[in-house]
Amino acid sequence: MHHPLPPDDTLYDQVRPILWTGYFLKLLDQRKLPFVVEYVECHSSEDVTQAIRTLIVRGAPAIGIVAGWGAVLAAREIEAVDGIEALRKLEPALQRLHAARPTAVNLAWVLARMRRTLSAAHADWRQVMECEAESIAREDITANRCMGAYGAALIPIGSGVLTHCNTGSLATAGFGTALGVIRAGIAQGRIARVFAGETRPWLQGARLTVWELQQDGIDATLIADSAAAHLMKSGQVQWVIVGADRICANGDTANKIGTYQLAITARHHGVKFMVVASAATVDMDTTAGEAIEIEQRDPEELLGVSGVRTVAEGIAAWNPVFDVTPGALIDAIVTERGVIQSPDAAQMRATFSN
């Protein structure tokens, strides 16, 4: 590395996309990265709803955390004697927040948690709501640091790693999931090389991941998504480390499109494959990946780059957002509850059925 390693990983965790001022919310506008670093102020729950809908904030954990603050801002627009009355008056705003990104699991989870908290609150319900929103953000960072330690312990000293999409501070309250493992591995001197796939069509790897790592002084090398197999064949990568949008009861994992082909390629080349996500991402009610509905986005996203069209008129495109990696191709699933190696239904049940 180009500078001495610190005794811990705090040096490698400088980016914060969500800032609560005590009066309003400031969100790093991820649509404008990496060339413009600009925060957007949200003074109402409607501002927060729009920020979620328009991708100012992205990443399932971050969306959930922001929704919690959206509920706090909504509370300023009503009067109520206790939490029960407040919940009744806040319900329309909470439903609008949920509708902004209805497929985000963390968003629904946070709003359900805020509802439970409110229903038990008394005259101090506003303060209780704000404390709960703070707790949600704080718990996210704590879980991410825990996952970072668990995941890094699996990585031999001197390893190279490849990641996909963006799973760092920009997608969470801080530190990140898969990128948190990489941060911890760098701090411990275990990781010698970091590669990031560009992640078409939104280019989260190219626009966000390598920028985020650069802010923390971590050297990263960008590759085209299509270069992954050649990179693995070269021997420069020992682990592929990715996040997850949903993990099924048998270990099958839905994640950003392109993850499945990385898992297949890794298995062929003897490269280990790690999935890192919070326990809230595990869906024990979905038995296997076949039951996951894969979201399709506008084909127009594939027909250009950064607003510049690169494809002739009249060309069709197919644009699924996620794919499903079978648990059999995953060497380790890492959550804040620990590590499941070679995951299967029995191990998942033992860890998460509570």
From Swiss-Prot:
Keywords: Amino-acid biosynthesis, Isomerase, Methionine biosynthesis
Any GO BP: L-methionine salvage from methylthioadenosine
One function term, GO molecular function aspect: S-methyl-5-thioribose-1-phosphate isomerase activity
EC number: 5.3.1.23
SUPFAM superfamilies to which the protein is assigned, alphabetical: NagB/RpiA/CoA transferase-like
Signal peptide bounds: none
Catalytic residue list: D245 (proton donor)
Residues where substrate binds: R58, G59, A60, R101, Q204, N255, K256
Residues at the site labelled Transition state stabilizer: C165
Pathway membership, UniProt: Amino-acid biosynthesis; L-methionine biosynthesis via salvage pathway; L-methionine from S-methyl-5-thio-alpha-D-ribose 1-phosphate: step 1/6
Catalytic function, reaction form: 5-(methylsulfanyl)-alpha-D-ribose 1-phosphate = 5-(methylsulfanyl)-D-ribulose 1-phosphate
One Pfam family linked to the record: IF-2B
Superkingdom of origin: Bacteria
Top EC class, one word: isomerase
The protein's role, per its UniProt record: Catalyzes the interconversion of methylthioribose-1-phosphate (MTR-1-P) into methylthioribulose-1-phosphate (MTRu-1-P).
Family stated for the protein in its record: Belongs to the eIF-2B alpha/beta/delta subunits family. MtnA subfamily.
Name of protein: Methylthioribose-1-phosphate isomerase
Lineage: Bacteria, Pseudomonadati, Pseudomonadota, Gammaproteobacteria, Lysobacterales
